[in-house]
Design a protein with these regions (language model features):
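Short coil/turn connectors at secondary-structure junctions
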Residues: 55, 76-81, 118-123, 188-191
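A glycine-rich helix N-cap at a beta->alpha junction
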Residues: 123-124, 138, 142-169
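Alpha-helical metal-binding/catalytic segments enriched in His/Glu/Asp
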Residues: 21, 83, 93-131
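Flexible loop/turn segments at secondary-structure boundaries
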Residues: 68, 132-135
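Short acidic, glycine/serine/threonine-rich loops at helix termini
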Residues: 94-96, 134-141
């Protein structure tokens, strides 16, 4: 029986990823201000999705802007093991809330790649859109639509304080031609699909 290589988390690589992401929207007091579907969020999504691609993950974006980065397993018909969080922040957010959940998932994939391991099930690292609800309400919008807590149509009615709809924000942040995610496959905005 062949032995399985030991997985080694590269804490410096994870830390460097966290610190690079924290630079986008960094405040002078050490926090981060990166509201959902803004220019800063677009830059953050571009950075993280670049790392996803570098790790060999295939990207899909649903209609509310959630990102699903998939590493196939030996049996792609099996349901994926999913992890992730969000990269938007509160107006005076920290460097780790949400970001760590996404980047820890990416680090797991990187470690599996480094060890040359193929999992039986696919792995998906998710970025949920507008989880903090600082720009659009309700909170947990992306994951809520995906999980069926409320409809896509309901979420698409959301407007920020300037009157911009979440649909316009998704088009700007996700589907802009200058955005590296513009070539992503689209996915339904529901776990049921």
């Amino acid at each position: 029986m062949a032995s399985t290589p030991a997985l080694q988390v590269h804490s410096a690589r994870l830390w460097d990823s966290l610190m690079a992401l924290a630079q986008i929207g960094a405040t002078d007091k050490g926090g981060v201000r990166r509201l959902a579907l803004t220019e800063l969020d677009r830059q953050a999504r571009d950075l993280v999705c670049g790392w996803f691609r570098d790790a060999g993950l295939k990207l899909r974006v649903d209609q509310i802007g959630n990102v699903f980065a998939r590493r196939e397993g030996s049996n792609p018909k099996l349901a994926a093991v999913a992890t992730g969080s969000h990269i938007d922040t509160q107006p005076s957010g920290g460097k780790f809330d949400g970001n760590y959940g996404v980047l820890a998932g990416l680090e797991v994939v990187r470690c599996l790649n480094d060890a040359g391991l193929v999992t039986k099930r696919p792995i998906e690292v998710c970025i949920w859109t507008n989880e903090e609800g600082s720009r659009f309400t309700p909170v947990m919008m992306g994951s809520g639509v995906w999980a069926g807590a409320f409809s896509l149509e309901h979420a698409q009615q959301a407007r920020d304080s300037a009157g911009m709809t979440i649909c316009a924000g998704v088009r700007f942040s996700i589907h802009s031609p200058r955005n590296s995610m513009a070539d992503c496959a689209s996915a339904p905005a529901s776990a049921a699909n």
